[in-house]
């Protein structure tokens, strides 16, 4: 009887030992899976997903978006209301008009910083410019017979060059000191229909994509991190960060969920991971929106009287009416008369020096757009950087309202880029405002799921110890 009891005890100990081995093995497998998932997620970062870690900038503490937008003259609640009720509907209609639908751009690569990106490397590099005989006659100047386009990534990154028969009236050609890629009529420029090439996910990933944002941020982030930085030195970082956030928002809002079935939709997890979880990125998005809005409203007289002729009289009159509504809306003027106060900048002895420094840095960022290896990313990058450069030109190049009325000259392409950029930012602000609760619920659900899983593991271990203790 005693031997039987001893054997029974030994059998129980062996059974308990096996359970512990299985439990430890399961935990090890889970940990390995987590490490692999994190590694793969890191490897899959794209141009829209790069978080600017090179900057090591201090992240703001979590807070709700209430009160005045930092360095601006409007509060979040007013911005959201005006954007939803007034600006966004007007801008949606405006960018669909013939004048604002077409953008002239140099699409082929001419990277001045790293020569290896000037060559096609991936499987979708075969997109080429059409022969001259295939171009619509409305083009102001013919393109060269053959120009290979540098293209990286996937088919969804390809620019659709389809145009309809619209004519353009040329505007004054002037130099923009803030950009390196001015509107110059030459064989490298082509018109692109922006409605056929929406800003969305393209599959542009890897070292080339990460290097773009690293190069952009390295031009200005060190100026921002210093505790003693003045407001002028922080502006460029905030503008770039806000634009970066907007790009990420558009990719998350129109994402390729299933490549096999070509299923597109919202990726709210990406929205949270790349934008919402970092309050400073949301704040900088609002800052950039108000900065560009200030430039548009400051140029009210110029934009309101400009010619928007494309050969379609009805559409052209509609365009002019929409522009006037955007730049002089009474609700906007009453609630947010000065979205951003540029008059307080460039004061003191260092003012001119800081301004020249900012111009040089932004020109470098503008030149980096030629290094983008994804054709659609390059298109929207060039358009939005030109739009931001135009806003800087309006606010900082011509001093005073009187001088602005007499001395401001904008290229047609600058006006197209400026209004399309304002629309992109408006869409991003609206999407963040509308979808933040849902995205945060999803993120919270994932966190709760993870916590519940690990809690089950800990509970299982505790229960095993308790059972083992009772059996011993």
From Swiss-Prot:
The keyword Signal applies. One of its GO terms (cellular component) is endoplasmic reticulum membrane. FAD binds at residues 200, 202, 213, 241, 244, 274, 281. It is a peripheral membrane protein. InterPro entries: Ero1, ERO1-like_sf. N-glycosylated. One of its GO terms (molecular function) is thiol oxidase activity. Its EC number is 1.8.4.-. The keyword Signal applies. Glycans are attached at residues 44, 267, 364. It is found in: Endoplasmic reticulum membrane. It holds the Pfam family ERO1. GO terms for biological process: protein folding in endoplasmic reticulum. SUPFAM superfamilies: ERO1-like. Residues 1-37 form the signal peptide. It comes from the Eukaryota. Its cofactor is FAD. It is an enzyme of class 1 (oxidoreductase). Essential oxidoreductase that oxidizes proteins in the endoplasmic reticulum to produce disulfide bonds. Acts by oxidizing directly PDI isomerase through a direct disulfide exchange. Does not act as a direct oxidant of folding substrate, but relies on PDI to transfer oxidizing equivalent. Does not oxidize all PDI related proteins, suggesting that it can discriminate between PDI and related proteins. Its reoxidation probably involves electron transfer to molecular oxygen via FAD. Acts independently of glutathione. Belongs to the EROs family. May function both as a monomer and a homodimer. This is Endoplasmic reticulum oxidoreductin-2. It comes from Arabidopsis thaliana. The gene is AERO2.
